[in-house]
Regions:
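Beta-strand-rich structural segments
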Residues: 125-129, 172-173, 211-228, 235, ...
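Extracellular Ig-like/FN3 beta-sandwich strand-entry sites
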Residues: 164-168, 213, 281-283
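Beta-strand-rich domain onsets/edges
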Residues: 190-222, 228-229
């Protein structure tokens, strides 16, 4: 088990100080909120498993947040997940990704927190990666480099304390030969001016009558197009055409708005709309609107249709005692 607690996009400084009892009823995604019975950090969970002589893998409590057991506060749902109830990754997700994935096959780097604070404020910055080295840059200047020893090391992220200045914070991951394998940037942002919608798995082919769901992420950007990572405006969502809206979620443990509504606020810059695919092919128009922001619109194409009458089966797996193919009249 782990029972580490964190809220997506919430950061309580400084990192070296354990912070739990907060008026916002949120847990710090930096990794400095802990419970009395749980692991002291995600790193400790990883190291305990890594350093055993044999391991079949790692079972973690929990992968996803879930409704109920709202420890350590009296809110709506748990804080234990590495992914929130809306399916958005928390920063701790990337620590486990760094430990369990191969940089030669799927290199990545992740820097947190977001980059928008008060000038001169000291900000704890962490970088997770499956690479051998990570480097942090602020507006093109190197802040420093850190070696991550995934096999024997006890510190599995690069860690810096940086005086905030507006601009771009960039993390670069390198392999053992110091060749760049991945990079990620976070940018300072202004006030939100418009909404943006993104379809999860846009290459997916949706089929009518197949009880399928489409997941649409709604976010906000500023006038320069940079994500506003703490946006919290209420968003009204409408769906027309060959599907319907089934619910909205933002992953906020303190939010008690209904999942089945058509209006809900973003939590730290994100809102998820879940759209059900109907019984007939065609197109689905999803619209999102918020006061004072330019609205967004997305079209989902439902290109195929299956029969929903009678009993269906997959011919390739049909079998009978004689071993013969199914008769033509069997559907």
């Amino acid at each position: 088990t782990a029972s580490t607690v964190q809220s997506r996009g919430v950061y309580h400084f400084p990192y070296k100080q354990s912070v739990l009892a907060d008026e916002d009823e949120q847990c710090s995604a930096l990794g400095n909120s802990t419970t009395s019975w749980g692991a002291k950090s995600s790193e400790m969970c990883i190291l305990t498993e890594r350093d055993r002589e044999f391991s079949m893998g790692q079972f973690l409590w929990t992968g996803f947040d879930y409704i109920g057991e709202p420890t350590p506060y009296h809110t709506r749902n748990s804080y234990f997940g590495q992914i929130d109830t809306a399916g958005f990754e928390k920063d701790s997700f990337f620590l486990y990704r760094g430990a369990w994935t191969d940089a030669k096959k799927a290199p990545f780097v992740h820097v947190f927190p977001y980059w928008n604070f008060n000038p001169g404020q000291l900000v704890d910055v962490r970088v997770a990666s499956n690479g051998a080295f990570v480097e942090l840059l602020l507006n093109g200047r190197s802040i420093g480099e850190y070696q991550i020893d995934h096999e024997k090391g006890t510190v599995l992220t690069g860690n810096w304390q940086v005086a905030y200045e507006p601009g771009e914070l960039t993390a670069i991951a390198y392999d053992e030969n110091h060749q760049e394998i991945a990079r990620e940037s976070r940018h300072s942002y202004g006030e939100p001016v418009k909404l943006v919608m993104e379809l999860y798995q846009p290459e997916k082919e949706f089929t009518a009558g197949n009880y399928d769901l489409a997941y649409v992420t709604i976010s906000a950007v500023d006038a320069q197009g940079y994500p506003v990572e703490d946006a919290n405006q209420y968003v009204e969502v409408s769906v027309k055409g060959a599907g319907w809206l089934t619910g909205l979620d933002n992953g906020d443990s303190t939010d008690t708005d209904e999942y089945k509504g058509y209006c809900r606020r973003m939590f730290n810059g994100k809102l998820l709309a879940i759209v059900a695919i109907g019984e007939h092919k065609g197109s689905i128009q999803v619209k999102a609107a918020a006061g004072g922001l330019q609205p967004a619109e997305l079209t989902i194409v439902v290109s195929k249709e299956i029969s929903i009458e009678g009993t269906s089966f997959i011919p390739e797996v049909f079998a009978n005692k004689s071993g013969k193919d199914a008769p033509a009249w069997v559907r």
